[in-house]
């Protein structure tokens, strides 16, 4: 089976894509944050865990800032955010804490109640010999703690101003 056939087969059972427009980035982020929270609530209710892949860029940053309020509003106190796992759809191989790292977007979500242990970060050069070592460690983390069958509940994708997709 070719990769294209596999993608087509897996996509057949998924809801159809839709395009929703809003007049401002703030409104887009509020809508996306609310939908993200709804999907993660459903996942945690069904399986006890929910997996979210975040992205960077200006829209990804704005969305990450809107997420803590949406998640705390969406989850009842008895649920909490302990079942949420955060991953990063694109990341840079730079030291931990570097301003260019997208994993810094997790700070507000950790403050809201997502356990730090559930933030799955790419190792930087201070912990990994090279980018291949870092990727191997993240692959092992994904195999151990990632979503069943590799299906994330929500994946945020960004499209930069130059039309480059961040996947």
Placement of each model-derived feature along the sequence:
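Phosphate-handling active-site elements
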Residues: 44-47, 73-81
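Active-site catalytic pocket residues across diverse enzymes, especially alpha/beta-hydrolases
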Residues: 67-75, 110
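Glycine-rich beta-strand-to-loop/alpha-helix junction loops that act as flexible
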Residues: 54-59, 157-161
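Conserved small/polar residues in nucleotide/adenosyl-binding loops
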Residues: 165-167
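Ligand-binding beta-strand-loop-alpha-helix segment within the catalytic cores
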Residues: 2-16, 78-156
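Short glycine-rich phosphate-binding loop at a beta-alpha junction
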Residues: 48-55, 153-155
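N-terminal glycine-/serine-/threonine-rich phosphate-binding loop
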Residues: 1-52, 145
